[in-house]
Amino acid sequence: GMHPEQVPYSTGDVVDAAISLSVYDSPRGAQLSGRILDLHPAGLGTKLAEQAAFVVALRRGTPLTEEQKKLITPERSDIVTVYRELQARRWHAEDLQPLCAKLGEENTGKTLVAVTALEQVGLIATVEKGGAKYLDLVPAQGKKNLADAPVLKCLEGM
């Protein structure tokens, strides 16, 4: 089982769930037991997985087409949007699907690259709280230049 704080969703989040149900007899009558097999934001299409695969390919050094690079290269405003969202709510570090869904499935690649860039320049870090890993803002030590993030340099140089 998982503790509730390890689930990357908050009260009110709309999710699609795959559940295994079983019915068993007990002295009080038939009982229903359920086990969650998978959770993800409701209504996700294929864009999230497709763009996430481009980001994985980028990290592995696999060449991307110009079109693929354009899909996952964030503008400064995209990175600011991700930073503000991380400021507004505690997001799980190990499952970024809810964050990507909130910021638009079509922006998944840009969101994932923005999170990586923010981590690489030291503006955010993964911290463990209550058995779960979260993305947390790091108090800035001097000025940070997003252009110094290796992931962004890699996208420019491809």
Annotate each predicted stretch with a short phrase.
Residues G1-M158:
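Acidic, two-metal ion nucleic-acid-processing modules in DNA metabolism proteins
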